[in-house]
Design a protein with these regions (language model features):
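Intrinsic disorder/low-complexity polar-acidic segments
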Residues: 158-396
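Intrinsically disordered/low-complexity terminal segments and short unstructured peptides
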Residues: 1-2, 279
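Feature for intrinsically disordered/low-complexity regulatory segments and propeptides
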Residues: 2-167, 171, 197, 360
Length: 396
């Protein structure tokens, strides 16, 4: 494990934050809401042991699709089994792999699930015999009974869930505070302070894994970073964070997102987020090589990086005055693709939050992200956030 230290002073207690600035990101919150207790883990080592154990009981292979026999089970007419070359025992598809199998042969999974098993078996068998790709890649697991965890095209590039978790453990240890990277603390809405020192429980953890995927979110919230001052003179504090995800059975891409943020609330929304960067890797033929040469090094680089460029960028944006008059403000925004209505709303947002009209690039960035938070349409929100990011980058 690479033990990392931070040059920023350690927080000894909760610290004041201003969450009216930056973006609100709900990805982690969506994961938090959807995970049952058996998908929540209290440490990275527990998470790793689970996903590593299932990988050790699994094996992948490529077989001819026409060689697969689909049968309705003898003791249950509602279930299907697959008989594949080299296996004496029939293999039971999971709910997920059944849907993948239907997709491979061009059959609608929802409709197929409604058919009696014998009829569904006939349809799937026909599809496999006439499958144009001729080959499929299976992921089978022996967990007391043989189970088909995934079935994909032959070019599918698998990245194992335990490989991602292992990469994170190299920089984060157990994720419980033994390094600077840990499960995040919680925002106190009454005092508007972020408390890094919260017990890790099933309710607060951000380390998740199911039979389809893995997702984890860690922060360095015990070393807050000051990047300028608020209008009242208090420091504007941030900390670093990242989340990562993968599916070894093909339900989603592999990805890593890194950012600076100001707080994490109890339902795991990210507040006051800036400098959001994301890498995604599709599970194509060379996915494993891309993970080894791109994603894993990018994660380590972010973990080891200095916040100095981020602080300098924020400082430059605060200091760069671009508009002192109302006409200048309108011209500045209209030239950057904002409609007349949007221009007025951005200026109103800054007036409301800062008590004065926007003057610096940073003021305009905060106004644009505040406007983005009011948008329910995701495409509109992302477009505004993209404009804010581009504007902030132009200052440095």
């Amino acid at each position: 494990m690479t033990t990392l230290t931070s040059n920023n002073p350690s927080a000894r207690s909760a610290f004041k934050v201003d969450i009216t600035r930056g973006e609100r990101i709900g990805r982690v919150s969506s994961e938090w809401f959807s995970r049952p207790d058996d998908e929540r883990f209290l440490s990275l080592s527990d998470l790793y042991d689970t996903v590593r154990s299932r990988a050790e009981r699994a094996h992948a292979r490529t077989i001819e699709s026409a060689a697969i026999r689909v049968e309705a089970t003898r003791d249950n007419a509602e279930r299907l089994e697959l008989v594949v070359p080299g296996e004496r025992q029939a293999i039971a598809p999971t709910h997920w792999s059944y849907g993948q199998l239907c997709s491979l042969v061009g059959a609608p999974a929802t409709y197929m699930r409604q058919l009696p098993a014998p009829l569904a078996a006939i349809n799937l068998q026909h599809g496999l015999l006439n499958h144009r790709a001729e080959l499929v890649k299976t992921l089978e697991m022996d967990d007391g009974r043989l189970e088909l965890r995934a079935v994909t095209g032959p070019e599918y590039g698998r990245i194992w869930d335990h490989e991602l978790v292992s990469s994170v453990m190299k920089i984060a240890g157990n994720g419980t505070g033994d390094t600077m990277w840990k499960v995040p603390g919680v925002l106190d809405w009454a005092t508007m302070t972020h408390n890094p020192f919260v017990d890790i429980t099933k309710d607060t953890t951000t380390l998740y894994a199911s039979d389809r995927d893995v997702f984890l979110f860690l922060v360095d919230d015990t070393h807050p970073i000051e990047a300028g001052r608020l209008p009242n003179g208090e420091p504007d504090l941030y900390f670093r964070g990242f989340y990562a995800w993968n599916s070894e059975v093909g339900s989603k891409t592999l990805g890593i997102a890194s950012f600076y943020l100001r707080a994490v609330c109890a339902n795991r929304n990210l507040w006051g987020t800036e400098n959001f960067e994301e890498i995604t890797i599709r599970h194509s033929k060379f996915a494993a090589q891309r993970f080894a040469h791109e994603a894993a090094p990018a994660l380590t680089s972010f973990a080891n990086s200095s916040p100095a460029p981020f602080i300098a960028g924020i400082k430059a944006a605060r200091e760069r005055i671009v508009a002192r008059k109302d006409d200048d403000r309108e011209t500045f925004l209209r030239r950057r693709g904002f409609s007349k209505g949007e221009t007025g709303k951005v200026i109103e947002m800054v007036l409301s939050e800062e008590g004065r009209p926007p003057e610096s690039i940073f003021d305009f960035v905060q106004g644009i992200t505040a406007l983005a938070r009011t948008k329910t349409n995701q495409d509109t929100r992302l477009e505004l956030e993209g404009k804010a990011k581009k504007l902030l980058e132009s200052a440095s």
